[in-house]
């Protein structure tokens, strides 16, 4: 058992013991002494009754610290264990973007009730955040940031930072606005601290800044933050007024979420599915992909059926053709994975990246030759037929070239038409390498059949 798993088990056991013993003071101290992330992970293993008891003996501040680090499923379970008034009290210790995420997961009726119970200014901010889809810049932004007028002196800006800084998640980047409230640039906290206190904020403002609109997809926002190494990126409307900011910790969550989603979708599994998903839901989520795979499997089967007569005369073909198609599938997956990753971080332009396409073809020739020769030697030893070995080499080269071509083009074409390459690429690439791999190998065998018998 790894040290990390052992630590998780110890946290879970200790947390459960304190809850069962109703040790409120010890539990509160435990939360303060440990990273809230570790506490949230331990809380995932609690049943609903234990979670309710945990909420009943903890202060709203302690629950808030755990809620901010909890995953979506645990947050939903927490809301079931808390009354509306208890939630409102907890929200007073949480960031607005986290509050919006939690409220967004509530039933419509309860969501309206809680929003209506909020103070006017909080209600306005949360309502604005809830307007945007969860996977957009507006959906993940926070309205807690520091904006300072350009006509204020640096010393006045410092006073404002001292006043509201403790409530703000990111204070390293200060946003500078004009008299109309429009964003005109940013200022680093380091520059503010080291500058003459009597100069204007406008004098230390960097006007070359990156901003995004509230409708931008969270994955595109993550690319910008990564590309320009930002700690926070402002979200602005058409008038360049700041609506909020997306912080780097939210971007990390986005990257993890998108990575997990891509891994699941490449396997034909929906991001909505988990171990707790009901049997009926799992069937609905998985069956469509399995049916698509069934169709592609029949395509490969029909290709083999065309050459049934050839296979009947040279039985060895049946064992070798699976090697050819399998190697093609693996090679195609390699190229496809590289392209999907490249598309996720930067757009791929065939006119610009044609050299990479040619490289994949040559790579298919070289890898096909090496693997084909190794396979051919084994085939010749086993079946004592040199011509069968030669056909194996040619087919291996051909199928790995096919794998390189389709592994490159399929993700690019899918992305061009607005489809997610991570979801559908593998089906088309595997189908191509299976069907064409069988066709090349069995077609050659049919042509040179007299030499194989």
Where do the language-model regions lie?
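Hydrophobic packing positions in regular secondary-structure scaffolds
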Residues: 1-266
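Alpha-helical transmembrane segments and their membrane-interface boundaries
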Residues: 255-405, 409-423, 427-431, 440, ...
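Active-site His/Glu-centered metal-binding helix of metallohydrolases
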Residues: 435-436
